[in-house]
């Protein structure tokens, strides 16, 4: 019987394959590292301008709560304007004042936004515990606003979470969005949807 033997690849071919494989792995690692290193933190003020709003989604999704006191023709949008601090600051906290509420449960937290009428009671915004942190990479924003809190009717609602958005380095115009589940109070189980836009000031 004829004996068959397996034929091995020439040593030079094997070495070439190993070199190519190692080079590709190195390039992939370098690319990932470069991408991560290009993310730059934006520490400063995200000014709140026209076009910023809050919406509230019913449990289960698909339907938005109508705020009869909204200044917009579409009552599912509650328009928000800058407060005394100009907007949302990263790297520092913007706590609610003491006391945090006035008569009838109206919020006195007016640094981030001017308290807005929601269902007959003014709500304000504050940041507590963890300062907001937002970075930009390739014109895309990412980060967190874990300490973002809505103050309304003598209650504080955590509305923090991861954020996404866009940023133009030439005009400094940004768009920032996120959503957060509401726990407790009369709107327990609803989801708050936030949309901020304006300019960033370092």
Label the predicted regions:
Residues 2-36:
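Secretory targeting and sorting signals
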Residues 16-18, 38, 45, 93, ...:
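Alpha-helical protein-protein interaction elements
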Residues 25-27, 134, 167, 187-189:
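Sterically constrained small-residue positions within well-ordered secondary structures
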Residues 35-88, 180-202:
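N-terminal segment immediately downstream of the Sec signal-peptide cleavage site
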Residues 44-50, 138-150, 177-179:
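Short, hydrophobic/proline-enriched secondary-structure or compact coil segments at domain edges
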Residues 62-167:
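Predominantly extracellular/secreted and cell-surface proteins with exposed
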Residues 156-173, 193-202:
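A short, surface-exposed beta-strand/turn
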Residues 169-183:
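Polybasic, proline/glycine-rich intrinsically disordered low-complexity segments
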């Amino acid at each position: 019987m004829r004996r068959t033997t397996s034929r091995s690849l020439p040593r030079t071919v094997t070495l070439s394959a190993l070199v190519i494989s190692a080079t590709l792995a190195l390039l992939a690692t370098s690319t990932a590292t470069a991408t991560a290193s290009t993310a730059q933190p934006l520490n400063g003020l995200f000014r709140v301008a026209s076009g910023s709003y809050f919406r509230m989604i019913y449990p289960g999704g698909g339907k938005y709560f109508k705020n009869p006191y909204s200044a917009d023709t579409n009552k599912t949008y509650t328009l928000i304007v800058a407060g005394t601090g100009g907007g949302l600051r990263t790297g520092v906290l913007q706590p609610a004042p003491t006391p945090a509420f006035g008569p009838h449960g109206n919020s006195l937290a007016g640094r981030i936004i001017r308290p807005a009428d929601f269902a007959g009671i003014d709500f304000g915004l504050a940041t507590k515990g963890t300062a907001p942190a937002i970075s930009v990479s390739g014109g895309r924003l990412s980060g967190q606003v874990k300490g973002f809190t809505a103050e309304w009717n003598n209650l504080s609602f955590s509305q923090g979470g991861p954020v996404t958005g866009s940023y133009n380095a030439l005009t400094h115009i940004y768009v920032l969005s996120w959503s957060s589940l509401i726990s407790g109070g009369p709107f327990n189980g609803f989801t708050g949807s936030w949309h901020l836009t304006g300019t960033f000031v370092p």
